[in-house]
Amino acid sequence: GTEGGDGGPLRGDTLVRSYINRLRSVTTTPISNYKDDPIYLSNFGVMTELDGSLSIDTLKFSDYFKSNPSDFAALTKNRVTSGNALIQATGTGSLYKAGTYDLSLTSSDNRQSFTAATLDGAAMVLENGTFKGDSTNTLGINIVAASGAPDTRIFIGNSLISSLREFSKSVLTPGNAIDNKISTYSDE
């Protein structure tokens, strides 16, 4: 129904409430796996008002963006990064899973070159100087370690846009749960 009016047949429905709650949580749910600390939409000045609408404090956005420009990727772009500048981490395809994974490197010459690596506790495949992820979580992750590189963490982050896209897909795909609810009410 309209604001303040009688609700329709889906008013109070648990599925509809769960969709609304998921959308409302956008401003409070941390965006993880981009760096050691999570990134919040509120860091960029995005706030939920009492009526449920969103607003942006442009000064807070500008200040945070100036001091943390790479954090903006958490809103717009899926990203694979390393916790150390001596290690280049990239992702190909879409089989790898968002997460923060420990990378361990093996060297027999005081870390001048590397003969083996594990990521997410699984051995990586070494191919032409590139270590390739070979576990369920890291398939498609490529690591190139420069001389002197330490063990570190690899961050695989799913952006806010990507998360919203997945949510939209689950809600809008034909035959989804909400279609089934509507069809049930239409049949009655």
Residue ranges of each PLM-predicted region?
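Bacterial flagellar/type III secretion structural subunits and associated motility module proteins
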Residues: 1, 9-187
